[in-house]
Every structure is written in structure tokens, then in C-alpha cells.
Amino acid sequence: MGRFDGRTAIVTGAAQGIGEVYAKRLAGEGANVVVADLNAELGEQVAKQIVADGGSAIFQRVDVADGASAQALADATIEKFGGIDHLVNNAAIYGGMKIDSLLTVDWDYYRRFMSVNMDGALQVCRAVVPHMRAKGGSIVNQSSTAAWTYSNYYGLAKAGINSLTQQLATELGWSNIRINAIAPGPIDTEATRTSTPQAIVAQIVQRIPLQRMGTPEDLAGLCLFLLSDEASWISGQIYNVDGGQVYRS
């Protein structure tokens, strides 16, 4: 018996990296998983792999910044599985110039960045929460320690995610819907390995008391715990998972 037998979970940004691990772990514990991502090719592969491994999954293409696309995600989930019990808002785009350049930033770029990294979580919640109100549910938002430690668009967006998490926890708790956030530090993913020079990685690791980068698996256990009934009295919390780094910044 798995913790999520008979339940349905949506994971956005699930075509690769952290979201892919979340989706596969949920399926491994019995959930019907909706692999939601803008990248259809990779997302379809993840869903097919879950099914090949004996799990239950479909892929649904979504642009979380678009309300109609988020609604289509919720509708497709209901049509296939009949309900929505869990949501992981993991979709994001990375990068961002320093805050001191905000006065001269390309506004279209800035708005797209924020619409995905901050507004996207709210868009998906707006589409999904009505289907949770009758019997409750749980949500995990993906934040970042960048909300406290870095001055860039990404940190600004993730600070917004933290506030959104706490605001919605207060509002949705009356419907037995819990919402928490995970704030990872530096995580070793394919995207990190291809975009970050090894010399920079070494510098990052030197600042981490536990002396290594995190992995998606380091986050997945907490994510599944927060979604599960084991965390039934936990809501509105932001969990740093960073090897102790944030307290040295």
C-alpha cells in the first residue's frame, strides 16, 4: 500500500529535473500523476516511463502563466481521473539580472519571468482549488533560498511564492486544503551541470556546511511528506533544504 493509493497529483515543471523526480516518486507510492510541462517531448517521455514502470500517469502540456492553459490542465485531470487531491507548483524559468538593473530592464522579459515564476503558481491554484474544496487537498509550492540570499528576479519571484504560500494557507485552511513551500539551495540537476562551470560549483560547495550540492531526491522525501496525511496539521510553512547554507549567507 502506498501513501497516495487512489489519489491524483498534478506536478508542474515535471518534464525533467526536480519535477520529474517528484512525479516518479508520487507514482511509485500509488498516485495517479499528471505530468504537466511546457515541453511536450520530454513530458510525454516521463509519463510513458511512469506507465512502463507500472504507475498511472498522463502528460498535459501547460503554460502556467496562462490562465486558460492552467484551467485546461485542471479540466484534463478531472476528465481522466475524476478528482484532484495534490498539487506541486514546480514550474519555473531560471536566471535573472541583478535587482539594481530593474530600472532599465526589458519590461517584456521581466513580466514573462515573473508571470511564470510567481504568478504561475497562483494561476494553477485558481484552476485546481475549486476541485479540492469538497474533500480537501494539499499543495506544495517550490520556492528557493534565493528569496533570502540573492538579489535577482528569481529571488524576487520566490519571495513572492513564500508570501503566496502563507496567504493561501490562511485562506484555504477553512476548506481543509493545506499548502506549504520547499525552498531548496543549490541542487545538482542536468540544467545545473550544463549551465554552471565546475569552478563556480566548487565555490558554491565551499559555502555549504554539509559540503555537497543537494539532489532532487533530497527534496522529494519532504515534498511527499508534506503532501501526505502524515503532515495533516502542517500548513503555511516554508522549509529550507540547503545543507545549512542560508544561515551562512
Each predicted region: which residue ranges?
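Substrate-binding pocket helix/loop in short-chain dehydrogenase/reductase
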Residues: 98-102, 106-111, 204
